[in-house]
Amino acid sequence: MPPGRPEVYQERFDIVQPHCSSEHTISLNTDFSKAAFGSATGLVAKAASQTTTAIWNLHADAHDFSNSSYLSKQVFAANLAHIGVAFIWLSGMHFHGAYFSNYLDWLQDPSIAPTAQQVSNIANQSVLNPIRVTSGFFNLWLAEGITSTYQLKVIAAFGLIASALCFLGSYFHMHSSTSFTRVLNTKLTSLSTHHLVGLLGLGSLAWAGHLIHISLPVNILMNAGVAVPSPHSLLSSKAVATIVEQLSFSALTSSDGYVWQPLVYSAMHHFALALVLIVGSVLGPLSTASNPLMSFTVGSSWHLVLGVQLFVTGTASVLYAQMSNAYPVYPYLLTDHPTVVSLFVHHMWIGGFFLVGAFAHLSIGLVRDTLPQSFSVVLTQRDIILGHLTWVVAFLGVHSFGLYVHNDTMQALGRPDDMFSDNAISLLPVFARWSTLTLNSTGSAVSVLGVELSTADFMVTHIHAFTIHTTVLILVKGFLYARSSRLVNDKYKLDFRYPCDGPGRGGTCQISPWDHVFLGLFWMYNSISVVIFHFFWEYQSNLASIKASAGGSIRALASDFELNSINTNGWLRNFLWSGAAQVIQSYGSPLAAYGLTFPASHFVWALSLMFLFSGRGYWQELIESVLWAHHKLYVVPHIQPRALSITSGRAVGFTHYLLGGIGSTWSFFLARIVATAG
């Protein structure tokens, strides 16, 4: 085994094929004792430094940390550097909000659109003015109690100071040779406790205190039309008591959908969460001694712990995406429909990537770190687990798409009464009667809270179940078979990723844990795309179906989603084709930026197909031809190009595929919602 790596216990899951005798068995040389993981050595390093292979090694070996005492220093330094970059980004957002946005105007009249970044009219760029802000920062700033640009500037300055401190700390932890850093950060369990207590626990407590003493009084005063004093004057409990006694919290429960009472519940939630994290991490189930994650060698594996944390964070991101519309916390968010859509879509994508990353790092941990014997119980039952999951996927796929096939057939035959719909064969979800659509109107602004479930929701929800279970099947299979399989029983010796060797060794293509992550990313893209398509179509069609009655109240008629999403043609015609009208026809209008992003993202997506549909031979021929032409012209590059490997080609392919798809969807959604409900 490589130096510094723990011995891997003997695999007890190797399955020997009975028809393979020892004399016909191919001997595989998987001894990596002379190689150093994470860096090439000897002639390989010398050759790679003069070729483009060195660039790919930087990406491919990004997670190849050695199990030395410097591991914690590397991880901690990278963590601080990442936080420093985040502080710079936050500082920039507050700086531009202070100097180049209409935040103060928005505070006076929250019904106007939040905008920023006035574009200079050099070559008719003023057509883009004003650039719409859909990040939700205006709502967040008001929830924080920020009422002036001076406060934004102060926060921007402190953000730069915090980023500088993080970068200095990163440099210190990475390059300091003192034993202080090594002793402080060697224990992974102590670092996890630090995150629970210091960051999450105390951070939640500080945020709860800020909400109670600053944010809630400021929002009460603003909603009551009273001049807001300096935040420093609100720090005393007497001032807060006076405000609450005179104005009460009823000012935060107005029915216009602007300022919602959940801001009060948010303070309670973070206070309770702080108590659970601080007390529980020391005495309770979150402590090192009783934490099931730390009870075996998971606690000594950075990758396994990171996988669990990514899984929890990704799940929390998906849950917040649902709450951004179902139970919004921030003031005036319900009437800012483009921001609601952006928050939902953004957090769904973040959750999807984090969940796939969780399985990737869990697989790396299983391959490279010592496994406890207790976990072998799960690995010995993996065939049964995957067998059941496969049948679930097959059942969901056949029946969920069968509903749409039935409706397509009945529509083609001219038999609408035999279709699954609210007006014919109704398939309402079980809890549909408890899910209601709440509509409120103040002036020209309309707020939408919740959703009414229909047969269309029942059908598309089963598509969600199918795509999500398929993604889980792929990722769980790659995770459980990361160490060994029927075909290759020594995967743990080959590491997390290894090249496709073709049929020579019995076929080792698409069986490494990396290949499962690669395939899982595409199915994650499918899953999230169907979810955000469902949400966006139903959300914007509910807005379009709202009609005002003679008495001033509002009601919702049958929406386009309910009527047309029950068959395949409706998704293609009413959603994609008709819904793309705004982004396609946006040239010469303030939506032109989305119109430019839309075809550009399509190009990036289409470029990915060149990498995904090609093999290594194509790139080898291409590079050889390019090199031949350079040598004929006596223009020889100093860094010699090398053909893309299969792994590298797939990495380039799925990166462009996902970025292009996300950019296309984002521009399509925003152009539509800004034009129709912005």
UniProtKB/Swiss-Prot annotation:
InterPro entries: PSI_PsaA, PSI_PsaA/B, PSI_PsaA/B_CS, PSI_PsaA/B_sf. Phylloquinone binds at W619. The keyword S-adenosyl-L-methionine does not apply. [4Fe-4S] cluster binds at C500, C509. Chlorophyll a binds at M610, Y618. P700 is a chlorophyll a/chlorophyll a' dimer, A0 is one or more chlorophyll a, A1 is one or both phylloquinones and FX is a shared 4Fe-4S iron-sulfur center. Signal peptide: none annotated. Gene3D superfamilies: Photosystem I PsaA/PsaB. GO terms for cellular component: chloroplast thylakoid membrane; photosystem I. Keywords: 4Fe-4S, Chlorophyll, Chloroplast, Chromophore, Electron transport, Iron, Iron-sulfur, Magnesium, Membrane, Metal-binding, Oxidoreductase, Photosynthesis, Photosystem I, Plastid, Thylakoid, Transmembrane, Transmembrane helix, Transport. GO terms for biological process: photosynthesis. Its EC number is 1.97.1.12. It is found in: Plastid, Chloroplast thylakoid membrane. The chain crosses the membrane at residues 75-98, 152-175, 192-216, 266-284, 302-325, 341-367, 384-406, 458-476, 516-537, 591-613, 651-671. It is a multi-pass membrane protein. PsaA and PsaB bind P700, the primary electron donor of photosystem I (PSI), as well as the electron acceptors A0, A1 and FX. PSI is a plastocyanin/cytochrome c6-ferredoxin oxidoreductase, converting photonic excitation into a charge separation, which transfers an electron from the donor P700 chlorophyll pair to the spectroscopically characterized acceptors A0, A1, FX, FA and FB in turn. Oxidized P700 is reduced on the lumenal side of the thylakoid membrane by plastocyanin or cytochrome c6. HAMAP family: PSI_PsaA (MF_00458). Belongs to the PsaA/PsaB family. This is Photosystem I P700 chlorophyll a apoprotein A1. It comes from Amphidinium carterae.
